[in-house]
Swiss-Prot record:
Major localization listed first in the record, in broad terms: endoplasmic reticulum
Keyword Chaperone attached: no
EC class (word): transferase
Family per similarity comment: Belongs to the class VI-like SAM-binding methyltransferase superfamily. Isoprenylcysteine carboxyl methyltransferase family.
EC numbers: 2.1.1.100
GO-annotated biological processes: methylation
UniProt binding sites for substrate: R160
Protein name per UniProt: Probable protein-S-isoprenylcysteine O-methyltransferase
Length: 191
């Protein structure tokens, strides 16, 4: 797979991921409740993706042989697809209970979701995003960004999950405790 094809697949993955996040947020929460932040694009995210493209372009120009490992690119593409599917299954399964912002106050529509993909992991949205994001870098054959994305995202989720679960335990009590004991978080080394 040529460097140009890798870059086009990367662009397509970004458009599909963010476009579908926005569409699903609008479908479950109404268009009035959806803002540009529903696209999940922050300054840090733009910086990370810009670094990834800079790495890809620099390596394609200076070390083009790094971009010729087609089997690595295909593994990355499979990761992108798997991550996207897991993430979207999480969103669709949770429906209105899935939000991009951690809720710190209980609301009547809150439900503990333990069926579907949530039977397999407590945080399929995070797991899917991690697989998707790292997959984009594997697909680009970006060694630096692959390692950086893995470490930064793991660190981010290792802090976000306990914070979110503090509130889930407040909202759902014993029911959440039992669920958490039976079902893994979905991310390695994060209980």
């Amino acid at each position: 797979m040529a460097a140009r094809a890798q870059a086009w697949l990367f662009a397509a993955a970004l458009v599909i991921f963010h476009g579908s996040e926005y569409v699903l947020a609008a479908a479950f929460h109404g268009r009035r409740n959806v803002t540009a932040t529903s696209l999940l694009i922050s300054k840090q995210y733009v910086l990370a993706m810009s670094f990834a493209m800079l790495e890809h372009l620099t390596e394609a120009l200076l070390f083009p042989e790094l971009k010729e490992y087609w089997f690595v690119s295909y593994v990355g593409l499979v990761m992108v697809i798997i991550g996207e599917v897991i993430r979207k299954l999480a969103v669709v399964t949770a429906g209105r209970s899935f939000t991009h912002v951690i809720r710190i106050h209980y609301e009547d529509q809150h439900k503990l979701i333990t069926h579907g993909v949530y039977r397999l992991m407590r945080h399929p949205g995070y797991s899917g995003f991690l697989i998707w994001a790292v997959g984009t870098q594997v697909m680009l054959c970006n060694p630096l960004s692959t390692v950086a994305f893995t470490l930064v995202l793991w660190r981010f989720f290792s802090k976000r999950i306990p914070y979110e679960e503090f509130f889930l335990r407040q909202f759902f009590g014993r029911e959440y405790e039992e669920y958490a004991q039976k079902v893994h978080s979905g991310l390695p080394f994060i209980e």
